[in-house]
């Protein structure tokens, strides 16, 4: 209920039939409030100066809005009620002549209620120009650290296993993500960035998947925070900074790279498999094998076919004539090679016969000759060799067509040097 600022008995002057009279009233001054405007309320008063019954005086109440007041001030009159002084109140609708025992107090209260609010409004309008357009500073967050984000843990299987629920503080430190207690700021869980498989953000949700080597174990953790985008950018920046710092080889990585890895070390794709196989036995202090930087291996040429390998090994023995391109494989070497002197051909034929002799069929085998296997460790036979003239002591062997003997001798000698397996003859 509103309380009046000023309450008392005053007199109002009336003119009736050209004669001025004073009528006693009770006046109350109310200031502007959420319940009403600044005003003066008048009630009829009896001779003893008290207000009559409210139910009877409701119809006799008069209201003067002080917002319509134009001027207030004292005035001198010849006749006023006893022990009173006159003052005037001018509004936009009517002029009032009033008298009161405490005239100065009534004038002061009327001026304060009627003109003080207008004066303040005029001063603000005269001195206050239009506000200068300003932009919000997105970096203004001095009340908390930029790397700490208040989060709400959402229920997941990993969060339930770690008994996480409620509000926490997630700090994106240079080397790890740390979950702290919201009250005591004590670190509860730590996830190093190398142990995070993946992370992401969607509106007000930040989520990441932890690996098996982290303190919390394998699983997905989801947090709700209004600064999810900022948190995701902070984690990405920290990972990028840490990755740039690892471009130079670390001492621990160098020590591991010098260890013999076995046959799998030749294949660069074997490193991730080896890291996954031994991840459970390595402690958290050892760096992940996936982080080791192996030097790039130059791609090797595709393995050639068998006869192409044989041809490369025997090309110095079969050189084409000047101006002709090198042959591609063995068969071209054999059939396109330039014939050599007869003495050399006969020597090769003798050597082919000796090598065939070392490859006789095993005991109990019915075939004439077995599959030719290398016999380099066999001792050299002490038999008579061909003379330079193509003859030897003793009975002469029946002659054969030389082109066929030359071709067979070359085939046997070439294949015996490279030692092809049984799969090359299938």
UniProtKB/Swiss-Prot annotation:
InterPro entries: Docking_Protein_DOK, Dok1/2/3_PTB, IRS_PTB, PH-like_dom_sf, PH_domain. Its main location: cytoplasm. It is a peripheral membrane protein. Changing residue 331 to F: Strongly reduced tyrosine phosphorylation. Abolishes interaction with GRB2 and INPP5D/SHIP. Residues 247-260 have a biased composition (Polar residues). PANTHER family: DOCKING PROTEIN 3, DOCKING PROTEIN RELATED. Belongs to the DOK family. Type A subfamily. PTB domain mediates receptor interaction. This is Docking protein 3. The lineage of its organism: Eukaryota, Metazoa, Chordata, Craniata, Vertebrata.
